[in-house]
Amino acid sequence: MSTVYFPGCKYTIHSRVNSRKIRQYLIRQHGIRQTGCCSTGLDTLTAGDTAIFVCPTCSAFIQEYTPKNRSLSIWEILENDDAFPWPDCGSDRITVQDCWRSFDNRPLQDAVRRILQRMNVEIVEMEMNFEKTGFCGSSLMKTQSPRYSRFAPVRFIKNASGKFIPVPAEEQEKKMQEHGKQFTTDKVVCYCTGCLHGLRLGGVDAVHMMDLITARL
């Protein structure tokens, strides 16, 4: 039995430096084994392994493709880590953007908020937060990945009817700009790269949670 970290392909592409920082920290401080892309790494899990994820899509794949393996978000691993070099955000007011792909994962959502509190963030909540969120940036305006039918057909096919509706790039930008009008803070934090790209497409000053916490790592 071991604990295995899935670093998230899209997050690693977004920030190879910060992805490497957190992987090295998990090895050094927690003895967590590393793997690569969930599409191939899931088959390396053995009975009793615990899978740690940063990506909400990885989470869905783990839960459906290897349901006998326990899964936890990286935020649940780190939230009580007193050795972690938490940044001090100086009481900044930051809005939390929850992701549809994790709408039913309250432990993840709560851990994100507890970490923000540890970093001295004044959290601002959206009306459509927690289980009410239907947001995942512009990713829901594109064709579904063929991986969905293999690894998470219930969540992303059966239970996502009418959710993925491809639209032209210019319309994606307009929809993201409209979404961004609701924010009352200068900065928005999210924990999904799809959400991040969508928010930034709409002109929002958005930051990924991992980028925020690794500032002093």
Which positions does each model-derived feature cover?
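Iron-sulfur cluster-binding electron-transfer modules in prokaryotic oxidoreductases
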Residues: M1-L217
